[in-house]
Swiss-Prot record:
This is Protein SprT. SMART domains: SprT. InterPro entries: SprT-like_domain, SprT_Zn_ribbon, Uncharacterised_SprT. The lineage of its organism: Bacteria, Pseudomonadati, Pseudomonadota, Gammaproteobacteria, Enterobacterales. It comes from Klebsiella pneumoniae (strain 342). The gene is sprT. One of its GO terms (cellular component) is cytoplasm.
Length: 166
């Protein structure tokens, strides 16, 4: 799927959110952390990721277009908090007490680990498989492993080997 173009007004709103939250953190922590790079190339069902060593935030352009305000209010500070925690505390648990503190006490944003966005537009195709008790949906990756003979999968309920439906 081709990466959609993000309108300049949305990019500006995202950048404004990033800069406002970074300024708040720099003020409260009495530091001058560098502004991270924003990249709109995150794929799959992740809303965003923080690349610690690169000081980079990657955002999912499809989910951003579908959930603009939530990205500005929640996703941007969420990923920024990961970068700030890494720079301030070093290597710690990704959503541990330091991250929660950074989100709530420094950035003033509720600390939620996962988003609740509708994912139909970014979800991968699945392939129907069957056992003796039900139908299963395998991802493209798992289906291809079966086709190449690299893997087999069993039902967690009945233990039967999953077989592709015709």
């Amino acid at each position: 799927m081709k990466t959609p173009r993000i309108p300049i007004a949305i990019q500006q709103a995202v950048m404004r959110s990033l800069r406002e939250h970074l300024a708040k953190a720099n003020l409260k922590l009495e530091r001058r952390y560098a502004e991270p790079t924003l990249v709109y190339q995150q794929r799959g069902t992740s809303a965003g990721t923080a690349w610690l060593e690169k000081n980079e935030i990657r955002l999912n352009p499809v989910l951003l277009l579908e959930n603009q305000q939530e990205f500005i209010d929640e996703v941007v500070p969420h990923e920024l908090a990961h970068l700030l925690v890494w720079q301030h505390f070093g290597r710690v648990a990704p959503h541990g007490k330091e991250w929660k503190w950074m989100m709530e006490n420094v950035l003033g944003v509720p600390a939620r680990r996962t988003h609740r966005f509708e994912l139909d537009s970014v979800r991968q195709n699945t392939f129907p498989y069957r056992c003796r008790c039900q139908q299963h949906q395998l991802t493209v990756r798992r289906h291809n492993r079966v086709v190449r003979g690299e893997a087999t999968y069993r039902c967690v309920h009945c233990g039967d080997l999953l077989v592709a439906e015709k």
